[in-house]
Curated annotation (Swiss-Prot):
Record keywords: ATP-binding, DNA-binding, Metal-binding, Nucleotide-binding, Repressor, Transcription, Transcription regulation, Zinc, Zinc-finger
Protein name per its UniProtKB record: Transcriptional repressor NrdR
Stretches annotated zinc finger (unnamed): 3-34
Superkingdom to which the source organism belongs: Bacteria
Length: 154
């Protein structure tokens, strides 16, 4: 590590501790040449996640796209923002657990469908109608009937 004061390339570590909830390491160093102290941070270099769209295009993963879709589906429903954040956190955890560098919009959509179904039935139907591209009222009604047969309390 080059010293920011004299540019000497040798230093010794005085102190080392985890920061950012264990996502980084903060190191206090002392230059061997000029004896000045400085701080460095060590972080894992995360591999960017790429989303493969239905048309084959690729784009960087964007949490806000999932979040906005779920928020729209839960509009005017008794669902708190905390519940929505937790739902999206759970989806992200599942995505990262796949250990894949590329993930399809189909997989993301299915994860949202599975999670939102347990959160709110109306939000589920709203999301499913857009995600599954319901063509007519019969498709919509079939999905509602399926939900009602699974959860008669709706």
């Amino acid at each position: 590590m080059n010293c920011p004061f004299c540019s000497h390339n040798d230093s010794k570590v005085i102190d080392s501790r985890p920061t950012d909830e264990g996502q980084a390491i903060r190191r206090r160093r002392e230059c061997i040449s000029c004896s000045k102290r400085f701080t460095t941070y060590e972080k894992i270099d995360e591999i960017p996640l790429i989303v493969v769209k239905k048309n084959g295009n690729r784009e960087p993963y964007n949490r806000n796209k999932i979040l906005n879709g779920v928020i729209r589906s839960c509009e005017k429903r008794p669902v708190s923002m905390k519940d929505i954040e937790n739902l999206v956190d759970g989806i992200e955890k599942q995505i990262h657990n796949t250990m894949e560098r590329e993930i399809t919009t189909e997989l993301i959509g299915n994860l949202v469908i599975d999670k939102i179904k347990d959160l709110d039935g109306v939000a589920y139907v709203r999301f499913a109608s857009v995600y599954r591209e319901f063509k007519d009222i019969n498709t919509f009604m079939d999905e509602v009937k399926k939900i009602l047969s699974e959860k008669p309390s709706l």
